[in-house]
UniProtKB/Swiss-Prot annotation:
Source species of the chain: Enterobacteria phage fd
Cysteine pairs bridged by disulfides in the record: C25-C54, C64-C71, C206-C219
Lineage of source species: Viruses, Monodnaviria, Loebvirae, Hofneiviricota, Faserviricetes
Biased composition (Gly residues): 86-105, 235-273
Assembly description: Interacts with G6P; this interaction is required for proper integration of G3P and G6P into the virion. Interacts with G8P. Interacts with the tip of the host pilus. Interacts (via N-terminus) with host TolA. Interacts (via transmembrane domain) with host TolQ (via 2nd and 3rd transmembrane domains); this interaction allows the phage translocation across the host inner membrane. Interacts (via transmembrane domain) with host TolR (via transmembrane domain); this interaction allows the phage translocation across the host inner membrane.
Region annotation N1: where it falls in the sequence: 19-85
Segments for region (G1 (Gly-rich linker)): 86-104
Residues covered by region (Not essential for gene 3 function): 253-262
Protein name: Attachment protein G3P
Length: 424
């Protein structure tokens, strides 16, 4: 008896329920972490895990171990944790034992027909006015680039709650010509939103918030199982206990991490592997790289840096030209040439010696113009004659014009020949 009393504190916390609510779970921040006991949805290929009483969905680039039961990524809370002991293994067992759909009696809350006193809701029966809360007379469909999260299947239709309305997947729509983009279309079918409070694949509870009725209507709901999420995807074997054995079957729905049921026998197990979703990873990378991109800010930053570099280079070039000019004109060695004062002091007058004076002796003596004087032939002779300056200046002008024209034609012909050779 003492041993039994000693074991009670160990058993009670293990089976205690979390005090989390849907609102508190959704308010939790995203976390980049590695979670264990991960399962994957076969249809959407999304990965899920229970942590601290909440259900988490892996987003972004997800890296998993070989058996895909431990994954690293950006985990986002999407609702309450899925109970891990509600039907497992091969779903066999004894009376009220292993599995909600096993060999024993089905628990009434998981029945396929409504329980007396409970309300059965069919979202497709048209009893609710179509449309959205914003515009009930015009149900505008929403277009999604990829299949959204938090959808559920009912009567072979995929539903989603959006902006207080229940929407149904109505196929794909293409838009644009270059490129052509394909969208997933969800059309409102009711002004009431539905949610599954337990995320266990059986819609036990639903709440309808109507745009036409301020009071929310809460009901018990009996329907088909959900496709997202439906733990465990990698369901393993295991048999429920004997008569009365197991709370609802062996294994934590095939997880294998906690052995048998909460009170019954059976060993959880199993493993699974799936295909890597390259498209989903590409979309996640694209979103992560572009979500904070500000084209105007990037252009402004690049322009500012280029202007700064250009200003620095311009100042350096102007300073160097000034130093060379001062050195050539005898104003002393400054700036980049200040370090050569000691060597230049040994030459002439040091840094005050204009360098140009040393080169002028090597320059050719160019002809200088003189004042025009009349040209006289045979001065003092009987055949003496002269040419006045006005005629000489006229000849100079005409001859200079001919030289200019000839020079222009020569230069033009030279460049034209170069261009012709390049084209050929």
């Amino acid at each position: 008896m003492k041993k039994l009393l000693f074991a009670i504190p160990l058993v009670v916390p293990f089976y205690s329920h979390s005090a989390e609510t849907v609102e508190s779970c959704l308010a939790k921040p995203h976390t980049e972490n590695s979670f264990t006991n991960v399962w994957k949805d076969d249809k959407t290929l999304d990965r899920y895990a229970n942590y601290e009483g909440c259900l988490w969905n892996a987003t972004g680039v997800v890296v998993c171990t070989g058996d895909e039961t431990q994954c690293y990524g950006t985990w986002v809370p999407i609702g309450l944790a899925i109970p891990e002991n509600e039907g497992g293994g091969s779903e066999g067992g004894g009376s009220e034992g292993g599995g909600s759909e096993g060999g024993g009696t089905k628990p009434p809350e998981y029945g396929d027909t409504p329980i007396p006193g409970y309300t059965y809701i069919n979202p497709l029966d048209g009893t609710y006015p179509p449309g959205t809360e914003q515009n009930p007379a015009n149900p505008n469909p929403s277009l999604e680039e990829s299949q959204p999260l938090n959808t559920f299947m009912f009567q072979n239709n995929r539903f989603r709650n959006r902006q207080g309305a229940l929407t149904v997947y109505t196929g794909t729509v293409t838009q644009g010509t270059d490129p052509v983009k394909t969208y997933y279309q969800y059309t409102p079918v009711s002004s009431k939103a539905m949610y599954d409070a337990y995320w266990n694949g059986k819609f036990r509870d639903c709440a309808f918030h109507s745009g036409f009725n301020e009071d929310p209507f809460v009901c018990e709901y009996q329907g088909q199982s959900s496709d997202l999420p439906q733990p465990p995807v990698n369901a393993g074997g295991g048999s429920g206990g004997g008569s009365g054995g197991g709370s609802e079957g062996g294994g934590s729905e095939g997880g294998g991490s906690e052995g048998g049921g909460s009170e019954g026998g059976g060993s959880g197990g199993g493993s699974g592997s799936g295909d890597f979703d390259y498209e989903k990873m590409a979309n996640a990378n694209k979103g992560a790289m572009t979500e904070n991109a500000d084209e105007n800010a990037l252009q402004s930053d690049a322009k500012g840096k280029l202007d700064s570099v250009a200003t620095d280079y311009g100042a350096a070039i102007d300073g160097f030209i000034g130093d060379v000019s001062g050195l050539a004109n005898g104003n002393g060695a400054t700036g980049d040439f200040a370090g050569s004062n000691s060597q230049m002091a040994q030459v002439g007058d040091g840094d005050n010696s204009p360098l140009m004076n040393n080169f002028r002796q090597y320059l050719p003596s160019l002809p200088q113009s003189v004042e025009c004087r009349p040209y006289v032939f045979g001065a003092g002779k009987p055949y003496e004659f002269s040419i006045d300056c006005d005629k000489i200046n006229l000849f100079r002008g005409v001859f200079a014009f001919l030289l200019y024209v000839a020079t222009f034609m020569y230069v033009f012909s030279t460049f034209a020949n170069i261009l012709r050779n390049k084209e050929s």
